[in-house]
Design a protein with these regions (language model features):
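Short, strongly hydrophobic alpha-helical membrane anchors
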Residues: 3-42
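Structural signature of hydrophobic alpha-helical transmembrane segments
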Residues: 36-45, 88-97, 149-159
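Hydrophobic, membrane-inserted alpha-helices
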Residues: 48-54, 71-77, 161-166, 183-190
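Membrane-helix interface "capping/anchor" motifs
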Residues: 56-67, 168-180
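Membrane-interface helix caps and helix-loop-helix hairpins in membrane proteins
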Residues: 81-88, 143-151, 171-174, 193-198
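Membrane-water interface of transmembrane alpha-helices
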Residues: 93-110
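Membrane-proximal helix-loop-helix units in multi-pass membrane proteins
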Residues: 106-163
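Membrane-interface capping segments at transmembrane-helix boundaries
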Residues: 107-109, 215-226
Length: 227
């Protein structure tokens, strides 16, 4: 089994360019592409709906994002296994744990005298996160490349590593979690198009917008806290 970074990124660029051209020119309504969405299974549509809803609620600082997120990650456990995106499948297990933690953490602070404030990332957290992403990507990517038939083992592992950090920061109400999500979601759009998961790719395209809204909302809250 061989893996070519050049081949992947050329393919990724072609897919992502085509996808956004269709979105921006309303070609999503063309018969051929509509047929692709029609062929999308009901399970993926359920994952898309719950995924978008939970991220939108998180952007609005709403605690009910967590139980809906739990439903979404369980659905995507099965979807990613079927698509041989094993790093993403493993990521859902982590998300399941972190969603339960986030639900508990937010509920605990909600019931306290003061709501948990939005915080910003520290220099130490940046260094530790960067180091963790590099080590995790190399370790998991190498394992998947040598031992499985995973699609895009290193790219998938890199996105998984970034997502681990972003999810932890989301649960801890760190403002910059949204910037990490924007970066990762842009990559994920191309990956999922490459695997013919068009509804999921569209969901992640919407995630980019929602993450931008979330960042602006949380930044406003952070500034109000410090005035």
């Amino acid at each position: 089994m061989s893996f070519s970074y050049t081949g992947f990124f050329l393919q990724y660029h072609a897919h992502i360019t085509y996808f956004w051209r269709m979105v921006l020119t309303a070609e999503l309504l063309s018969p051929n592409l509509m047929q692709l969405f029609i062929q999308t299974g009901w399970l993926e549509w359920c994952g898309v709906f719950t995924g978008i809803l939970c991220v939108w609620l998180a952007a609005k600082n709403n605690i009910y994002n967590w139980p809906i997120a739990i439903v979404s990650v369980v659905i995507y456990l099965f979807i990613f296994f079927d698509s041989k995106l094993y790093a993403d499948m493993g990521l859902q297990v982590y998300f399941l744990i972190m969603n339960a933690y986030g639900w508990y953490f937010w509920n605990k602070t909600k019931n306290a005298t003061h709501e948990r404030p939005v915080s910003t990332i520290t220099s130490k957290e940046i260094l530790l996160s960067a180091a963790g992403i590099v080590v995790f990507t190399y370790g998991l990517g190498t394992f998947l490349y040598k031992n499985t038939d995973a699609s895009f083992p290193f790219v998938d592992s890199f996105c998984t590593a970034c997502s681990l950090i972003a999810q932890l920061f989301l649960a801890r109400k760190v403002l910059q979690n949204w910037l990490i999500w924007i970066f990762v979601d842009i990559i994920y759009v191309g990956v999922y198009i490459s695997k013919d998961l068009y509804a999921t790719a569209l969901m992640y395209a919407l995630y980019i917008y929602i993450a931008a809204v979330g960042y602006l909302n949380w930044r406003k809250t952070y500034r109000e806290q410090n005035n």
